From Swiss-Prot:
Main location: cytoplasm
Organism of this sequence: Bacillus cereus (strain 03BB102)
Positions with a binding annotation for L-ornithine: 166, 230, 234-235
Protein name: Ornithine carbamoyltransferase
Gene Ontology BP, a term: citrulline biosynthetic process
Keyword terms, alphabetized: Arginine metabolism, Cytoplasm, Transferase
Gene3D superfamilies: Aspartate/ornithine carbamoyltransferase (3.40.50.1370)
GO cellular component, one term: cytoplasm
Gene: arcB
Length: 316
């Protein structure tokens, strides 16, 4: 086996992409591409990852469990509602106890503050598998997918059209970190969090990225390389039927994509609500790479797990 550099990360946890430098992100992506070609590398032999879920999941649960098996370890599913934490035990106490049993924690929950406390009180790595505010593992896979298509981030233009949600937040930070241009188009009142936008703009000043928040989807996708969308109603927002009317002009369809480059690629974090945020014609079309993108969750997360768990200089 050829020598491969395991990324050295200056963080115990991954809660948001703010914690990673541009160099660390690129290294993780390159390592993920290596692991994609070499799936059965027992780099985490005997390691146990606790998987705490308070939200429904397909991609996050399966990709983390499969990733740990491929790396020689084990993923242990923990239903947050069935744990004592769901009956009043503090996050702090839970963190300290789990640190004695397992080697790392992935948590998918609602409150980002709870994940921050879990990481603070744990002596083992904590990975944010999704909160209401951030989805960093998805953004890492998104960057990997873009990088595989372009082999660069310089000069690449990404448009995100839809709800300014957790996926949008992580993409803003990701784009700013790697120096990629990103335009967001949302209906009025559904813009991304102002503080996160400010953080992305500050990072962009250092990396040469361009960040723009608009309300016109046609302007947002003008001559872009990638068009990205997500569901209009995230988990926990069900019942907000008025959003369907407000978001209809933001549907990714054959008319909207004519404003992008002819070579554009379509991205979606999935699950998709077909004929709502995107038409079947687009998501199943030749320029859609959503299933390759979904597959890259596995490889990007494996790279992250190895880097956080082993924190060593070289893999041989």
């Amino acid at each position: 086996m050829s020598t491969v550099q395991v990324p050295k990360l200056n963080t115990k946890d991954l809660l948001t992409l703010e914690e990673l430098t541009q160099e660390e992100i690129i290294s993780l992506i390159e390592f993920a591409i290596y692991l994609k070609k070499n799936k059965q590398e027992p780099l985490l032999q005997g390691k146990i990852l606790g998987l705490i879920f308070d939200k429904h999941s397909t991609r996050t649960r399966v990709s983390f469990e499969a990733g740990m098996v491929q790396l020689g370890g084990h993923g242990m599913f923990l239903n947050g509602k069935e744990m004592q934490m769901g009956r009043g035990e503090t996050v702090s106490d839970t963190a300290k106890v789990l640190s004695h049993y397992i080697d790392g924690i992935m948590i998918r929950t609602f409150s980002h503050a709870d994940v921050e406390e879990l990481a603070k009180e744990s002596s083992i790595p904590v990975i944010n598998g999704l909160t209401d505010d951030h989805h960093p593992c998805q953004a890492l896979a998104d960057l990997m997918t873009i990088y595989e298509e372009t082999n660069t981030f310089k000069g690449i233009k990404l448009a995100y059209v839809g709800d300014g949600n957790n996926v949008c937040h992580s993409l803003l930070l990701a784009s700013a970190k790697v120096g990629m241009h990103m335009t967001v188009a949302t209906p009025i009142g559904y813009e991304p969090n102002e503080e996160i936008v400010k953080k992305a703009l500050a990072i962009a000043k250092e990396t040469g990225a361009e960040i723009e928040i608009l309300h016109n989807p046609e302007l947002a996708v003008n001559e872009v390389d990638f068009i990205y969308t997500d569901v209009w109603m995230s988990m926990g927002q069900e019942g907000e039927e008025e959003k369907y009317t407000v978001f209809q002009p933001y549907q990714i369809n054959k008319e909207l994509v004519t404003h992008a480059k002819q070579t554009y690629r379509f991205l979606h974090c999935l699950p998709a609500h077909r004929e709502e945020e995107v038409t079947g014609e687009i998501i199943d079309g030749p320029q859609s790479i959503v299933f390759e993108q979904a597959g890259n969750r596995l490889h990007a997360q494996k790279a992250l797990l190895v880097s956080l768990f082993k924190n060593v200089e070289e893999l041989s």
